[in-house]
Amino acid sequence: MAEYVNYVLGSLYVSDTATSTIPTDVRNFIAPPFPLNFWSGPTFTVRSNTRADPLKLVAARHRAAAAAIDTLEAQSQYGVANVDALIRPLERQVAKVADALAALEDAARAAESADAATPQVNASEADQRPDNIGQSLSEIQIAKNDVPMEFDTNLAVDLLATVFVSRAAGGSNGVVFGTWYRALQDRLVTERPVATRSIDYRDGRMSKTFMTTAVVSLQSCGRLYIGNRPYSAFEAAVLCLHLAHRAVNSNYTYPTSFSGLIEQLPVYIEAFSTALGDGTLGKVGYEFNGARLPKNQFHVPGGGGRYERGALNGHGVLETLIRLKVLPAIPGSLGTTSTAVGPELDADQTAYIDDVNKAAAAFLVRAQNLFLTEDQTLLRSTINTITALLLLRRLLWNGNVYTDRLRNNFQLGAIVPNLAVSQRDARGASGGDAAAMVSRSGNNNFTFLCERYVSPIYIANREVELTQLFPGLAALCLDAQTVARDQPQHRAVNVSTGRNQTNLTRLIGIELENRRRTAPVPINEVLAAHDAVALQYERGLGLLMQKPRLRASLEETRRLGQFNVASDYDLLYFVCLGYIPSLTSAM
């Protein structure tokens, strides 16, 4: 039998199929010669050697895996080389930046050394002791019967760190600051748990991070964060008080430097307090016209310089400054800009002469104008600063720091290490000493504070505000809403401190959250929280100044006791630090 199929007509050309006749036959299928035994070949039948195929498959897989490993190794070596080539230029740039930063630090250190070596010009008593100026930059004294203390950048924060370090030396964190701070921390833990992840409040302890943030937040109540101003509200307030004193006292020897003006603040405040009562027939008001002020905003809206007309009216401090011609008339109060002030209102044509700007040029010498009536945000803050100084004078009036030391909750000897108190400075150590010193101190404590505390801190930091100097005063003002709700005949003690400090809790929470977030809280939210606290502080100033028996009302309602204040000595340190620490035994 032939190996290939034989066609009936033999082979044909496909091109001839149109003219050729192909008989019908099953074998006449046009196809190439096809093997007859193709389908029975070994390709389509089961092979007899079944063990050789898996071995070949495994060997092929091994070879493929080895090839893949070799490829990956080559790629990794190539990638390492590329990464090294990319990192080396970055490392060189980082090294250059580090060198530049080191050079800047050296230059800043040299500048600080040069500034420290530059002699300062002071006045009054400071004019007579120039050798002590460099020492006063970092040395302050709060109470007469205590030794001076040196601080770094922020006295309240530095001393707070010392408090926790001294207590932790015994392996314990038993430090308390009163029920007010306890309620504030508990409310923060409850309402803003995200913010409290960075504080340690285990077993009911007071957190150092929380206390530091709270004190800094209290110090920020009187600061202005919008705008670039060459003068602070504290500086403007001192200049206004100085000019007011000159207006009511013609025969007086005045200092020749701004630090000398600060030391004379008690005298200026005393004269201004008298002028406040002389200029009004009724009760002196310490609040602005809230109906015309912007809601929930401290600064002038829209970035302008003026509030709505009449917004600042009604405040006794501002009216007294205008009456004494310390400040010119508020723009628009004596007529429009297109109409000149008539002789019947301003015979000497001096209504708009600003002596504050002249005083700033004489004492501060910064070649910058200071027109408070044009920057009414600064004017508002200045009025609040003067009001706070009046309140501070009332709080410290006739305070006795020489009472029995064991009656004081604040013990400096338990906080400051190696405190060597001489016998001369240890007055008030026994009840007998206190009995021998029953005479009224008047304004002596405030005077000593301005000379040995306020003036040195201002020399060290020219941009300091009053709330940074007295955070405890800011805390009392924020707590004034609680005092305002107490009725005269209502004897129940109000312990709901936390709910009245929603604004402060919010500001503290935002500050703590910003320390943990990679993306900080938007600046608008931070400014809104700060303005809310500033407005509450301003309202508290007015409420406390309206109380005729301020110290008695605060003691009767236990508002001072919630801050651990038990004596005049404690109150003096509280207004300066913002807290009174008490060390407790471990449980």
From Swiss-Prot:
Subcellular location: Virion; Host nucleus
Stretch forming the signal peptide: none
Record flagged with keyword DNA damage: no
Region entry Disordered, spans: 113-132
GO biological process: symbiont entry into host cell; viral genome packaging; viral penetration into host nucleus
One GO cellular component, as annotated: host cell nucleus
Disulfide bond annotation, renumbered to this chain: none
Region (Interaction with major capsid protein/MCP): 1-53
Keywords linked to the UniProt accession: Capsid protein, Host nucleus, Host-virus interaction, Viral genome packaging, Viral penetration into host nucleus, Viral release from host cell, Virion, Virus entry into host cell
Pfam families recorded: Herpes_UL25 (PF01499)
Chief place of localization: virion
Keyword Repeat in annotation: no
Role description: Capsid vertex-specific component that plays a role during viral DNA encapsidation, assuring correct genome cleavage and presumably stabilizing capsids that contain full-length viral genomes. Participates in the interaction between the capsid and the tegument through interaction with the large tegument protein/LTP.
Family note: Belongs to the herpesviridae CVC2 protein family.
Subunit structure: Heterodimerizes with CVC1. Interacts with major capsid protein/MCP and triplex capsid protein 1/TRX1 at the pentamer vertices. Interacts with the large tegument protein/LTP.
Protein known as: Capsid vertex component 2
Record lineage: Viruses, Duplodnaviria, Heunggongvirae, Peploviricota, Herviviricetes
Gene: CVC2
